[in-house]
Amino acid sequence: SKSAAKIPAGSRIVCAEQKGSRVLICDASISDWNKEGAILWEWSPSSDTAIAPEHRKWFNCLSEVKPVKNATAILVTASGGGVALVDIKKNKASFYAFDSGNMHSACLLPDGNIVTASSDGDHICLFDIKNGCPSPESAKKKIYYLKFAHAVVWDKKRELLWAMGLDEIAAFKYAQEPEPILEKVDSIPLSGAAYD
C-alpha cells in the first residue's frame, strides 16, 4: 500500500493478537502481515516455560503490550488479570503475576517496579519486583483505589505516574525508599465516562 511505502525500513510495530493470545513484533514496512518475513518475533504465554501451566489463563485476552528497557523487553497485560515482563532475546517472562481481572495497562517505573491498571478491581497496583520475586504468588504489591482504572503511564519529565480512571486522570508521586509507595498528588476531572 502507499502508506506502507512511506514507512522507513527497519520500523517495527508491537501488537497483541487476542485471537491467538500472542505478542507480535512485525515489520511495519510490510502491509500484509500474512507474508513471510512480516512477523519478526512472537511470544505466547502458552509456550513460555517460565509461566506455570495453571497460570496461563491469566493471559487470556491480551490487552496491552509496550516495549520497555530500550526495546529489549515487552510489558504485557491481559484481561485475565496477568502482567508479564518478557525478555525479547530469551523469549521468556522474567517476571509475571496476577492482580485482578480486566487488567488494561501497565508501565515500568524508573527503578524497574511495575504499576498496573485494573477496571474490575477499581485500582492501580504497584508491584515491588526490583529486589526479585521468587514466585507469582509471592509478588509484593500495593493497591491504590481508582474507579474503573484503565491506563497508566510514567511521565519522565515530571517524574509522575499518570493513571486514568472512569472520571479522572490522577497524578501520583513515586517514592522508592524506604519502600516503594505511590502518593496521589493531583487529579484532573473528566467529563463523561473515560474508556481506553
Segments (PLM) and residue ranges:
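Conserved beta-strand positions in repeat-built beta-propeller and related beta-rich domains
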Residues: C15-K19, D27, L75-G80, T116-D120, ...
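Repeated scaffold domains used in trafficking and secretory/extracellular systems
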Residues: K2-K6, A52-K66, S100-L109, L146-V153, ...
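Blade-loop segments of beta-propeller domains
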Residues: I39-V83, I88-S105
